[in-house]
Amino acid sequence: MKTLPDNPHLDHLRQQAKELLAGLRDVDPTATLADAQAALAGQYGFHTWPELKAEVDRMHGQADTADPSLARAVADRFDLGSVAGPMRSLARPDDIGRRWSITTDRGRFTIRTMDTWLPIVDADTDVALQLAAAAAGVLLPTPVRSRDGEVVESVGGHRWRAYHQLPAGPPLAAPVSAAVAGAVGDVLATLHGLALPVDRVSPWHARRLGPASWAGLAATATARQAPWAGLLAAAVPALEDLAAVGRDVPVPDPVLTHNTLGPAQTRLAPDGRLVVVGWEHAGGQPPAWEVANALLDWAVAPHGRVDAVGARALVDGYRRRAGGVPTRCLADFRGAATGLVNYVYEQVEAALAAETTEDRRYADRGVRHLLTHLPTRTTLERLLDAVA
């Protein structure tokens, strides 16, 4: 599920809907802007566009402002310049920490806490990947090291890292236009072509991480009277089937890569180029797995319909850069399926542990959205058929 920023603007949602319309029309040429608005609302976990607009109105102006002394301390540690305005939160905390924006006399920067970061590779390694990707033509916010040369620093009881901020629009929403899908394929081929070594496949994609069985977790949700408990119980067979995708097939060699290159980690620059953010989860994946993951993230429309035009554009973009495409069979979706199963498990546990009314409201909406939008083997097979 997409997450609204802390200070959402309706103009950004309108822009997202217009960009989404291009992808929807590849699936259904009769799609309208109203269809795109409704689809976007669904991606944010709301039933209708008016409900999403009402949430934007409710949240507008609610971004948190950091203590000025903390802003100055972080800016000083990373040598960002003299603080020229309030340091404001950009979004609610995620699985790593929380993103903030700070403006100094040297420009605008995105800084984020790393308090709950579970690294797949160390920060120096992900920065090396970013710099190599940028040198190869990938557009991304340049990471900033501290005065002491560190990527992550402790300031004010939190761990921080910083990036230069690039002018760009809101996060993208799938399905996207063929041009954007092709750019995604090009970025993936560029990263894989770097062939940077890594010692393992990301655990997130390699194996199921949650200790409890799905049936046991569903029973816990029922006992806690979670509003989505029935949906989870009904989804147990689908989740178990996804976890079995490619299980008995040998794992190909991984390369160091972005690892989460979905719509939430991309923006469009003013010139239309793809901006790639969210490198903190960098790690190892076999190229075939990451391309398959991208097809699932980028080429599936609402209600599980496959965007064949977008899927072909993505692999064509990859092929133009790399000379070929590694994804060939259902087993290549193993990483995507395993990662999705782990994500569902994590979100269910977070929803059961949520304490405040606002956190429960957000978590319940997210779990309900996940459980009603799970792909199936049929979805994966249709993606393969689209790019055969």
Model-predicted regions and their roles:
Residues W160-A174, L217-A223, A337-E358:
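A glycine-centered beta->alpha junction motif in the catalytic cores
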Residues G61-R147, P270-D271, A386-A388:
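Conserved NTP-binding catalytic cores of kinases and kinase-like/nucleotidyltransferase enzymes
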Residues D95-D105, T110-I111, P143, A243-W289, ...:
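Active-site acidic catalytic loop and adjacent metal/ATP-binding pocket
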Residues M1-Q62:
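Intrinsically disordered, low-complexity eukaryotic regions enriched in glycine, serine
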Residues A174-L231, P252-P254, R361:
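A cross-family kinase active-site recognition segment
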Residues A221, Y343-A388:
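ATP/Mg2+ or Mg2+-diphosphate-binding catalytic cores
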Residues T104-D199:
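ATP-binding pocket architecture of kinase catalytic cores
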